[in-house]
């Protein structure tokens, strides 16, 4: 038997370090060739690291949330044959491996499967039902168990694991549900008014850490100013309904988003200073002819901004189809690195949750972001009469270092004019 060291691979584009997001294995596991060992993140792209060989895990080289250098030791395996690490008294024992979690002493083999199945209930009978792990300690569980826990609304932090090294099994979830139900029944109506003293320490790692760093950097570096304008989209919504009725079956249903993209594309012809990126270190503003619109998209892991490239070159349905593809790729974690960078202006919409006013954060190094609020029906005065109209606010933010307030207001007024008179969206 020999020792095989797997190093953090170079995943391209000159990346010098990555963040370890999640282990898919633990010390003592046997792994096959090409089996996924871990997930790492660079910028906003998550990459799975497979094992190049089969073997048994001897040591893990880091904890989730840790930043690791490319070429650094990721994992050690015991393999058949000589391995790639020369055996010596010093090398026989890894110098400073980091286990996935603090290892418990291994227990003797269980005598019968029935005893293993009953272990979770025995543990829960002897311990407090809401006892949790130490802050920062990640519960061990398979992806299937984690997914089931999410579906059931269970925090794994509070589930006692009966597997090796405290690993949470499906039986532990069953036991937790059974015990949780009995507590709720015994508590009666007053249970909802009981004092709570539990707390949970959630490490800010992976995509959430990247979002935090990017938002902090943008707010620290960019002097934001926001501008809010209301828009009458009654005629636009009538046009959208007509197009969907006539062409929706053949070309797909249109949402409001491709109309907004089209309005921005047309308006930016007269305001190229807003379709730009500002290098504040070189003090250079680069204006772009191509309109690459970042589409702020919420995923299960956090905010992603896939890029609709060359929005000026597509019609409504072309942009709608590409936006749908990018949004699905972002939500499923399959977006490519190049699809998440290179935008020249960003469009942010919270849909029906859009509220009345928002103050979106600029996607640095861009100089503008257009925020879309929800559509509401309101009484408006038109031609001296009070009528019901569909109204929507645009809440936009700009970099005041390179964008003057008058230019920002004029740009939004141009977008407003296009949306309130939708036929002008298609005049060249």
From Swiss-Prot:
Q: Which domain of life is it from?
A: Bacteria
Q: Give me the Gene Ontology terms describing cellular component.
A: cytoplasm
Q: Does the keyword Transmembrane helix apply?
A: no
Active site: residue positions: 400, 404
Entry's transmembrane regions: none
Catalysed reaction per UniProt?
Answer: N(6)-[(R)-dihydrolipoyl]-L-lysyl-[protein] + 2-methylpropanoyl-CoA = N(6)-[(R)-S(8)-2-methylpropanoyldihydrolipoyl]-L-lysyl-[protein] + CoA
- Could you tell me which residue ranges the Peripheral subunit-binding (PSBD) domain spans? 140-177
Q: Does the keyword Acyltransferase apply?
A: yes
Example GO BP: glycolytic process
Task of the protein:
The branched-chain alpha-keto dehydrogenase complex catalyzes the overall conversion of alpha-keto acids to acyl-CoA and CO(2). It contains multiple copies of three enzymatic components: branched-chain alpha-keto acid decarboxylase (E1), lipoamide acyltransferase (E2) and lipoamide dehydrogenase (E3).
Q: Into which family does the record put it?
A: Belongs to the 2-oxoacid dehydrogenase family.
Q: What is this protein called?
A: Lipoamide acyltransferase component of branched-chain alpha-keto acid dehydrogenase complex
The major lineage groups are:
Bacteria, Pseudomonadati, Pseudomonadota, Gammaproteobacteria, Pseudomonadales
